[in-house]
């Protein structure tokens, strides 16, 4: 597979718009495209998947390590890969570029196409571009200018190619039709945008018209065959995964590892009446249960089914929205609805982010599921809290940008159920997954 990385100088620079537009444009040209996303985000990969018809893949060095990123990348399918970056090109976990888009690009040996959305700049923009080019040994293959007029583009193209050792590939004109709304986790889910196909099609037409595709094709680079040693032995397990509009945040790596362990049955907490029969493990990922709390609470037979099975000792792992769903109730402004009620207490939405970013869990409580001292790299992003009268199992360690470390206890254990706000990629935490399933 040949691939490129789409990055920018900051968040909000147009990466997602350009990345999905390029994917669609390439597909119109007859290519089989694989989407990738740098970092832990769940939303952008859903856009990729909607366009390409295949699961997008997260490439996250903090959550999976460099070898995990290589393995996940190698599992992609298609002739061309488009990797959407995160934040600015060199922005990672701390004040250096570790775990950044640049780190991923260098790990995979891929060139970067910069997407920039300039305003009232010319020579200063060139200085910024030269800084991006010279900051580290990342191959900058070209530049796409976003959300500008044709006359401004002509001015900037001349300035950049005069002052910078960089090729300007084209531009995307200002177009109000390309705007996408937002929700508290960033972009809203692709399945909720009624005119998503139209927006993507408009963007792809701009790309076909205003981007030099011949030059873009020259930037795509073939990568070597990377080793993939992240596999598990089939245990003939029957695994139930909650999946619908309320619960859709799952890393593709996690699903594939569970598929290796046995057979996955997907079910909908919104629509189905009860859990699948004779299952060995229940996985409830994140999502937006607070948005659909009325529908979830009305499905009383499902709530009862889950609680009964957990009370009987069914093994379960729940993340973020899954944790909220297992409490007694979810409060969202004026809305309040009953949830599963396995954990004593409730969850409540907040206006501000409670925790955000990379961290590391450490099992500090003696228990029968996870070995004490086990460390698990994770990511948190939530605007809610839980108040539960249950045993906590993890100590979380979070390194701040200034180098200080914050600690607090989190995550809950009851019976054979473990639930926490943290999102975990099993590819980088194989021992954690094994422990969840081996009791």
Curated annotation (Swiss-Prot):
Gene3D superfamilies: 3.40.50.880, P-loop containing nucleotide triphosphate hydrolases (3.40.50.300). Keywords: ATP-binding, Cobalamin biosynthesis, Glutamine amidotransferase, Ligase, Magnesium, Nucleotide-binding. It comes from Clostridium tetani (strain Massachusetts / E88). SUPFAM superfamilies: Class I glutamine amidotransferase-like, P-loop containing nucleoside triphosphate hydrolases. GO terms for molecular function: ATP binding; cobyrinic acid a,c-diamide synthase activity. Its EC number is 6.3.5.11. It comes from the Bacteria. Catalyzes the ATP-dependent amidation of the two carboxylate groups at positions a and c of cobyrinate, using either L-glutamine or ammonia as the nitrogen source. The record marks 423 as: Increases nucleophilicity of active site Cys. Pathway: Cofactor biosynthesis; adenosylcobalamin biosynthesis; cob(II)yrinate a,c-diamide from sirohydrochlorin (anaerobic route): step 10/10. InterPro entries: CbiA/CobB_synth (IPR004484), Class_I_gatase-like (IPR029062), CobQ/CobB/MinD/ParA_Nub-bd_dom (IPR002586), GATase_3 (IPR011698), P-loop_NTPase (IPR027417). This is Cobyrinate a,c-diamide synthase. It catalyses: cob(II)yrinate + 2 L-glutamine + 2 ATP + 2 H2O = cob(II)yrinate a,c diamide + 2 L-glutamate + 2 ADP + 2 phosphate + 2 H(+). One of its GO terms (biological process) is cobalamin biosynthetic process. Belongs to the CobB/CbiA family. Its cofactor is Mg(2+). The active site is at 320 (nucleophile). The a and c carboxylates of cobyrinate are activated for nucleophilic attack via formation of a phosphorylated intermediate by ATP. CbiA catalyzes first the amidation of the c-carboxylate, and then that of the a-carboxylate. Comprises of two domains. The C-terminal domain contains the binding site for glutamine and catalyzes the hydrolysis of this substrate to glutamate and ammonia. The N-terminal domain is anticipated to bind ATP and cobyrinate and catalyzes the ultimate synthesis of the diamide product. The ammonia produced via the glutaminase domain is probably translocated to the adjacent domain via a molecular tunnel, where it reacts with an activated intermediate. Residues 238-431 form the GATase cobBQ-type domain. It holds the Pfam family CbiA.
């Amino acid at each position: 597979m040949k691939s490129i990385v789409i990055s920018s100088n900051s968040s909000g620079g147009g990466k997602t718009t350009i990345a999905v537009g390029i994917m669609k444009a390439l597909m119109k040209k007859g290519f089989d495209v694989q989407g990738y996303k740098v970092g832990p985000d769940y939303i952008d990969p859903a856009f990729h998947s909607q366009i390409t018809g295949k699961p997008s893949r997260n490439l996250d060095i903090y959550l999976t390590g460099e070898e995990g990123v290589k393995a996940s990348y190698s599992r992609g399918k298609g002739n061309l890969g488009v990797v959407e970056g995160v934040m600015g090109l060199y922005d990672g976990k701390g004040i250096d570029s570790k775990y950044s888009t640049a780190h991923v690009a260098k790990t995979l040996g891929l060139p970067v196409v910069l997407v920039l959305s300039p305003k009232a700049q010319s020579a200063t923009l060139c200085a910024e571009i030269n800084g991006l080019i010279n900051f580290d040994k990342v191959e900058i293959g070209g530049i796409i200018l976003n959300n500008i007029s044709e006359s401004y583009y002509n001015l900037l193209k001349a300035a950049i190619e005069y002052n910078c050792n960089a090729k300007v590939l084209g531009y995307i004109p200002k177009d109000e039709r390309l705007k996408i709304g937002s929700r508290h986790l960033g972009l809203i889910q692709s399945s909720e945008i009624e005119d998503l196909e139209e927006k993507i099609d408009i963007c792809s037409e701009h790309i076909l018209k205003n981007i030099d595709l011949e030059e873009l094709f020259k930037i795509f680079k073939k990568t070597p065959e990377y080793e993939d040693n992240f596999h598990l032995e089939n245990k003939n397990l029957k695994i139930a995964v909650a999946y619908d509009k309320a619960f859709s945040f799952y890393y593709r790596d996690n699903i594939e590892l569970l598929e290796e362990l046995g057979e996955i049955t997907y079910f909908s907490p919104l629509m189905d009446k009860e859990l699948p029969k004779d299952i060995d493990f229940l996985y409830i990922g994140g999502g937006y249960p607070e948005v659909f709390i009325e529908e979830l609470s009305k499905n009383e037979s499902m709530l009862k089914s889950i609680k009964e099975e957990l009370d009987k000792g069914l093994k379960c792992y729940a993340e973020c929205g899954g944790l909220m769903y297992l409490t007694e109730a979810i409060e969202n402004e004026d809305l309040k609805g009953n949830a599963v009620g396995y954990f004593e207490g409730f969850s409540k939405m907040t206006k501000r982010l409670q925790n955000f970013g990379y961290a590391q869990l450490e099992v500090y409580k003696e228990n029968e599921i996870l070995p004490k001292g086990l460390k698990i790299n994770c990511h948190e992003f939530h605007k809610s809290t839980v108040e539960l009268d249950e045993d906590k199992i993890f100590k979380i360690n979070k390194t701040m940008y200034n180098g200080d470390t914050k600690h607090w206890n989190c995550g809950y254990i009851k019976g054979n159920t473990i639930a926490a706000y943290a999102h975990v990629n099993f590819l980088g935490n194989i021992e954690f997954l094994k422990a969840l399933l081996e009791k």
